[in-house]
Amino acid sequence: MKTFTAKPETVKRDWYVVDATGKTLGRLATELARRLRGKHKAEYTPHVDTGDYIIVLNADKVAVTGNKRTDKVYYHHTGHIGGIKQVSFEEMIARRPERVIEIAVKGMLPKGPLGRAMFRKLKVYAGNEHNHAAQQPQVLDI
């Protein structure tokens, strides 16, 4: 018996919608990363993108434990000398709440072309509305 390897053209991808209201950021992000990679499927193959599309709603209502709401800091560098910038979790939620979930999930995906392809299947929205009704997403309870 030969080992089954998924082919990119035969992978069936489903669309799911997740409500992030009250969900803990890290626990939500790990499950999203797992499903974007396709590890929940029997035909999972490490070098093939077998994951599903995921729509996350209410990103502005995601929860963090402890004092992370005030203490957690996101850093990025502009590329110029002395150009390190920092933004707290509260400021990030106020400015761009989608980015909080995107950063958490992106760090859990593989680095490289395959990981970028997986990340493109994640759609995050701050509010309760999305424009993917034509794909008929199923509700996923995490």
UniProtKB/Swiss-Prot annotation:
Keywords: Ribonucleoprotein, Ribosomal protein. SUPFAM superfamilies: Ribosomal protein L13 (SSF52161). Gene3D superfamilies: Ribosomal protein L13. One of its GO terms (cellular component) is cytosolic large ribosomal subunit. InterPro entries: Ribosomal_uL13, Ribosomal_uL13_bac-type, Ribosomal_uL13_CS, Ribosomal_uL13_sf. GO terms for molecular function: mRNA binding; structural constituent of ribosome. Coiled coil: none annotated. Pfam families: Ribosomal_L13. GO terms for biological process: negative regulation of translation; translation. This protein is one of the early assembly proteins of the 50S ribosomal subunit, although it is not seen to bind rRNA by itself. It is important during the early stages of 50S assembly. Part of the 50S ribosomal subunit. PANTHER family: LARGE RIBOSOMAL SUBUNIT PROTEIN UL13M, RIBOSOMAL PROTEIN L13. Belongs to the universal ribosomal protein uL13 family. NCBIfam families: rplM_bact. This is Large ribosomal subunit protein uL13. It comes from Shigella sonnei (strain Ss046). The gene is rplM.
